A protein has these predicted regions:
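Phosphate-binding glycine-rich loop
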Residues: 1-36
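A short helix->loop->beta-strand "cap" motif at the edges of active sites that frequently abuts
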Residues: 35, 56, 114-118, 143-145
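Conserved core segment of the aminotransferase class I/II
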Residues: 140-174
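Active-site phosphate-binding strand-loop segment of PLP-dependent enzymes
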Residues: 59, 63-131
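Short, intrinsically disordered, charge-balanced linker/junction segments flanking boundaries
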Residues: 1-6, 79, 106, 168-174
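Hydrophobic residues at beta-strand termini and immediately following loops
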Residues: 16, 61, 150
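Substrate-binding/gating loop at the entrance of the active-site cleft, primarily
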Residues: 17-21, 25-28, 38-56
Length: 174
């Protein structure tokens, strides 16, 4: 409701022991040995290390300050994504604190649909660093068919150590 996204709590939300559990389970569910995973650079190291642990190849995509830490879509479009299964994004972004704009989410959804891959937005800082409108990638038209969003109450509700999170996606992904 905070993000204006309609989800069926019986089949489109998965409670988690923190969002890191969601990172693990999502990667295990979608990535096989030899696949590729697009990871933001800079970005959360777990996306890369977990991909390597599973025998997948992490492929960095650049986030630069001159672009407001948003993906360079020309660079993404030029990539061979035939072996890519997941694209990780993390907005509000850590370590920079940058927020995604609606256009970034729209372009990520379009990219995922055309390339037949899944975008995972790791969104645990949404209520800490998101001044103004709270954005969810799942609020974008068509996103529920190709996107997953993780969130964590531990950070947003000042509950460190409680490990309370959730995964939101279409019922098939959940």
């Amino acid at each position: 409701r905070w993000f204006g996204v309609q989800l069926d709590p019986t089949c489109e939300i998965q409670p988690l022991i923190g969002s890191k559990e969601g990172i693990l389970h999502t990667t295990l569910a979608f990535v096989d040995h030899g696949d590729q995973v697009l990871v933001p650079d800079p970005g959360y190291p777990t996306y890369t290390s977990l991909s390597r642990l599973l025998g997948a190849q992490p492929v960095p995509y650049n986030l630069r300050p001159e672009r407001g830490w948003q993906p360079d879509f020309d660079e993404l479009e030029a990539m061979d994504t035939s072996r890519v299964r997941l694209l990780w994004c993390n907005y509000p972004h850590m370590p920079t604190g940058a927020r995604a704009c609606r256009e970034t989410y729209e372009r990520l959804v379009d990219f995922a649909q055309r390339r037949n891959l899944v975008v995972v937005n790791d969104n645990p800082y949404s209520f800490i660093l998101n001044e103004g409108e709270h954005l969810s990638i799942l609020a974008i038209d068509g996103a529920k068919e190709c996107c997953i969003e993780l969130n964590s109450m531990s950070k947003s509700h000042n509950m460190p150590g409680w490990r309370v999170g959730m995964l939101a996606a279409n019922a098939e992904f959940v």
